[in-house]
Regions:
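Outer-membrane beta-barrel translocator domains and adjoining extracellular loop/strand segments
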Residues: 35-41, 48-49, 92-100, 145-158, ...
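Outer-membrane beta-barrel signature, preferentially recognizing the C-terminal barrel domain
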Residues: 30-81, 86-89, 100-127, 163-168, ...
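Structural signature of outer-membrane beta-barrel domains
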Residues: 19, 29-33, 75-77, 87-91, ...
């Protein structure tokens, strides 16, 4: 897996005035397969509750990124940014199903021909002093993404988004910072849209040794809330409390299939492929600086 690559990048900024500017950036990056992804051995993935086998034929994935961004800085520490972006993936690596040991289906890895992602992104950082909350600030990041995988000519796979890509992302948070009390508090919220976690198999798909169709596995939308508190005592001691996933909502992987009944009617049927509750993570840390 020795390759000689060139990764060009370009960043330009047009400053309209002290508060407004426009940025244009381009960059090329690489996603190399991990060792276990190119190994022919089988291992068990506890999150998927399934065996996973590597693929010795995997290739590097090359990503071209293009981003056009408008930025407005209303005041110190504040930002409103709106961006449009485009990403092209050459040979993206995806989770997929394969047949091993007869008819047993397990997860593996496979290169798609290519994929294109494009969308819009909004960033906001705002102090809340204008409503009387001088020690509070608010941040928001949201994106809408359109994703489409390109297949080899003659392939029978249907159009679909790239595995792992959500159609939307939401991250927002409230922050409290009090200098006299030497205290920082953050409450963060995150949500992702429905996304393919495992690529299924179309009937007669190129390279398949079976004509059986397996629906894609989707990770369903889920809300997460994280909390953190940091407090300094004097010049040397600091205590930190972190709570991840306060809501502890269940994680659902679902499959959707079109079923034709004996009377000729069709209906989409959904099945829960996996469901588990990850639980909360609580951490308490004490830091003493000499």
């Amino acid at each position: 897996y020795k390759t000689d690559d060139v990764f060009p990048s370009l960043n330009t900024t047009y400053k309209i005035n002290d508060q407004h500017q426009v940025r244009l950036s381009y960059g090329r990056s690489i996603n190399r397969p991990e060792f276990r992804e190119v190994s022919s051995s089988v291992y068990y993935d506890f999150d998927l509750a399934s065996n996973v086998q590597g693929n010795t034929e995997l290739k590097n994935c090359y990503v071209d990124n293009l981003d056009l961004r408008y930025e407005w800085y209303p005041s110190r520490g504040e930002l409103i940014s709106l961006a449009v972006f485009y990403k092209h993936f050459d040979s993206p690596i995806e989770w997929t199903y394969t047949v091993a040991g007869g008819t047993d289906l397990i997860y593996s890895y496979k290169n798609a021909k290519s994929a294109n992602n494009y969308g819009v992104e909004l960033d906001i950082r705002k102090n809340l002093g204008f409503i009387g909350l001088k020690d509070f600030s608010w941040s928001f990041n949201g994106a809408l993404i359109k994703s489409k995988v390109q297949f080899e000519k003659g392939a029978k796979e249907e159009d679909r988004p790239m595995q792992g890509q959500s159609p939307y992302l939401i991250n927002t948070g409230i922050f409290y910072k009090n200098e006299p009390l030497k205290m920082d508090i953050a409450l963060l919220y995150n949500r992702i849209g429905k996304r393919i976690i495992g690529v299924g198999r179309s009937e007669g798909s190129t390279g398949d040794d079976s004509n059986s169709r397996v629906p894609h596995s989707y990770e369903m939308p889920r809300n997460t809330i994280d909390f953190s508190l940091a407090k300094k005592f004097g010049e040397h001691l600091e205590l930190k409390l972190n709570v991840r996933d306060l809501l502890a909502e269940k994680i659902y992987y679902k499959q959707f299939a079109d079923v034709t009944y004996s009377d000729g009617s069709k209906k989409e049927v959904e099945e829960i492929a996996r469901c588990y509750k990850p639980g909360r993570n609580i951490g308490l840390q004490a830091i003493y600086k000499f």
